[in-house]
């Protein structure tokens, strides 16, 4: 998909995610202190700060890796009090990580397909015997992932094991896997860390 094919004219809507007075400590060390913000529909919101400022910890609070001692996270009007990363993903909150969490021996396409797991309805029997439901689901999932691959302009390396790819392309694959879950909120942790100028420019364009 070329740059001029990407529709950026999405209207900004009301709050989809609200972070209210979050505080998080590890022992006597305060990682986050009384922090609040919200994210509007179709908005890009950045959390900026030096290393150790608590940026990753904040994302971990949002998607359920950490539970803050104080404050709340509200998503679509629902307070996420006992959320886990899996539940967050099911509800439509997807993320990437500061340190890549890819399956290095799997191809770029197969890594992105992992992101479709939440949309899989076929059971073990359906898959084992390749029943129509499983075949239809596999076709739909591959089609969706092929669209993401085209959008991220990684068609030429989709069958390459991720471990053999340059770092910048691995970051694209990780973004693709997050997009494959079709999230409403996409949390990107240090999405351009370790990239050169050209790779950063490309990542900005995709975001």
Feature roles, as predicted:
Residues 2-207:
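Glycine-rich phosphate-binding loops of nucleotide-dependent enzymes
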């Amino acid at each position: 998909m070329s740059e001029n094919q990407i529709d950026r004219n999405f209207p900004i809507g009301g709050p989809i995610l609200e972070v209210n007075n979050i505080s998080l400590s590890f022992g006597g060390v305060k990682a986050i202190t009384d922090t609040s913000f919200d994210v509007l529909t179709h908005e890009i919101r950045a959390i900026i700060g030096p290393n150790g400022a608590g940026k990753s910890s904040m994302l971990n609070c949002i998607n359920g890796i950490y539970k803050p001692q104080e404050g709340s996270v509200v998503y679509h009007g629902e307070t996420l009090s006992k959320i886990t990363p899996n539940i967050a993903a099911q509800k439509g909150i997807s993320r990437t990580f500061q340190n890549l969490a890819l399956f290095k021996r799997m191809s770029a396409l197969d890594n992105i397909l992992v992101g479709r797991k939440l949309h899989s309805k076929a059971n073990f029997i359906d898959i084992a015997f390749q029943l129509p439901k499983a075949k239809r689901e596999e076709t739909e999932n591959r089609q969706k992932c092929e669209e993401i691959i085209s959008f991220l302009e990684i068609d030429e390396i989709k069958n390459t094991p991720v471990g053999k790819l340059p770092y910048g392309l691995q970051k694209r694959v990780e973004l693709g896997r997050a997009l494959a879950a079709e999230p409403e909120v996409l949390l990107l942790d240090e999405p351009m860390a370790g990239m050169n100028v050209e790779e950063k420019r490309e990542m900005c364009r995709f975001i």
